[in-house]
Amino acid sequence: MTLSWLSIFRLGLVQLCLGALVVLMTSTLNRVMVVELALPAVLPGLLVGLHYAIQITRPNWGFRSDTRGNRTRFVILGMAVLALGAFLATLGMVWMQTAYLAGLVLSVLAYTLIGLGVGASGTSLLALLATATDPRRRAAAATITWLMMIFGIAVTATVVGKALDPYSAERLLELVALVGALAVALTTAAIWGIERRHRSASPVPAEAPVPFRAGLAEVWAERRARHFTLFIFLSMTAYFMQELILEPYAGLSFGLTPGQSTQLSGAQNGGVFVGMLLVGIAATGLRIGSLRAWIMAGCLGSALSLLTLALIGQTPEGGALLLPATVALGLFNGMFAVAAIGSMMALAG
């Protein structure tokens, strides 16, 4: 039995929760550390980089959820660890004002937990989608879940940003705790029972689990999987490299205020949303182009958009092109992301 559209939407709520928590760590805390606390910009950059580096454990989380047969548990526990890490990261940032070393140590621990939580929850969720979704619905399923993640990012940033005005450390701690609690509760309610119904309707013979190293070696031996892995490594490095750079670049090169640069980031996420929606409709509904073609278009378009952003910063008249170039970058990022996820699920299936 494959997932219904309602079940796919429910799993998308988990992605929404992931986006809601992660954006607070990579955007809100980043700004507060650099602007309000006047800490070196390299510090939040390293902390955000740490949470991405920890996610190299994703293959192991996927393997564990596959072999132990309870992805729901990994999704819920991962979200709980992420929520705890988010609260501790906020607390560590507050401590840095009076006890810098203690706050830094707590922040390192917190961002480690954030990376583990995102890896466990996000990977197990995608594994469930890949194995339980009808092949004809995979591109649409990827689009729905990732659109909901972008939606969660946009809504959380907007609501929390308004609630934080005027800023206070106590208020930020309260908001992060509230978002974390809501994320864990919504994740539990959204995913509960989906995997059990799919497993009971599609029984498979029990097999002895393959050891992780043996399974990894088997996958790596497959030419398509190996090449796709290397491609994703390179492309996602480029995809996330601009995350902590775009807003400072807009301020330094074009004189945008923090509010204006935040709006620029929102415009980029709007482009990502449209790009994902475009590929979902075109690839699944209208049968236009293959996922491979959409991936290539997304990568080439992203490269050209990023090059344009770099070049317009060298000319006085370039400010007029900043917004359209940023939206275009988001559009092509979204096209690439959802097509790549769809291709990954096709390989897994």
Task: Go through the PLM ranges and name each one.
Residues 1-35, 112, 220-242:
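Pair of pore-lining "gating" transmembrane helices in MFS-fold secondary transporters
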Residues 66-84, 100, 284-300:
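Cytoplasmic membrane-interface "Motif A"-like loop-to-helix N-cap segments
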Residues 56-70, 164, 275-292:
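Helix-to-loop junctions at the C-terminal end of transmembrane segments
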Residues 292-340:
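C-terminal transmembrane helical hairpin of 12-TM major facilitator-type secondary transporters
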Residues 1-5, 195-229, 253:
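Juxtamembrane intracellular "pre-TM" segments in multi-pass secondary transporters
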Residues 54-58, 139-164, 268:
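Glycine-rich segments within core transmembrane alpha-helices of 12-TM secondary carriers
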Residues 79-101, 299-317:
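C-terminal ends and interior cores of transmembrane alpha-helices
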Residues 27-43, 244-262:
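Short amphipathic helix-loop junctions that connect adjacent transmembrane helices
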